[in-house]
From Swiss-Prot:
Gene Ontology BP term (one): spermatid development
Name the record gives this protein: Insulin-like peptide INSL6
Taxonomy, superkingdom: Eukaryota
Lineage: Eukaryota, Metazoa, Chordata, Craniata, Vertebrata
Gene that produces this protein: Insl6
Pfam family for this entry, one: Insulin
Residue stretch(es) of the prosequence: 53-161
Native organism: Mus musculus (Mouse)
Annotated Gene Ontology cellular component terms: extracellular region
Entry keyword Secreted: yes
Length: 191
């Protein structure tokens, strides 16, 4: 009976040994340079299966061009009520085709106002009548750089020398763990 328990524990220990080595590999820094570092970061950041998400509503092309779709339809730059017509048909419809090939008469802009819903969500339009448009644009830039500074301080800590040394240099010279390489994915995460 004792031998059976001991042999079971021995086999259990032998089976768990490879799994304990995997945890050591994740916490151990690895020196990666150049394309090897890039491949590891891409593997780490792109582990989730993006094909199961419906990306059409979030695509920037569908915000600007409602006729564009990723579901196999081709993009049609010539819809009937579009500003594209101004550049693709420079001659008014009443002019003959022969005369149209020898003259270039640009049409006027169509009378249509852009709605705020068609603009990018973070885009802001400032006029000079509002007082200080430069100050407002600087404030918007500060918000985006504050996020980057937060990411940087998570990775580098408060050491100025470490901040000066780049991410690739640190991983190449000293080495990076998987947790440190995961910080490279943070700028691509939408908060």
């Amino acid at each position: 009976m004792k031998q059976l328990c001991c042999s079971c524990l021995l086999w259990l220990g032998l089976l768990l040994t490879p799994f304990s080595r995997e945890e050591e590999e994740e916490s151990r820094p690895r020196k990666l340079c150049g394309r090897h570092l890039l491949i590891e970061v891409i593997k780490l950041c792109g582990q989730s299966d993006w094909s199961r998400f419906e990306m059409e509503e979030q695509s920037p092309m569908t915000q600007f061009f409602p006729h564009y779709s990723r579901k196999g339809k081709a993009f049609n730059p010539h819809p009937s009520s579009s500003a594209w017509r101004r550049f693709t048909n420079p001659v008014p419809a009443g002019v003959s085709q022969k005369k149209g090939t020898h003259t270039w008469e640009p049409q006027s802009l169509p009378d249509y106002q852009f709605e705020k819903t068609e603009l990018l969500p973070k885009a802001r339009v400032f006029s000079y009548h509002s007082g200080k448009p430069y100050v407002k644009s600087v404030q918007l830039q500060k918000k985006s750089t504050n996020k980057m500074n937060t990411f940087r301080s998570l990775f580098w800590g408060n050491h100025s020398q470490r901040k000066r040394r780049g991410f690739a240099d640190k991983c190449c010279v000293i080495g990076c763990t998987k947790e440190e390489m995961a910080v490279a994915c943070l700028p691509f995460v939408d908060f």
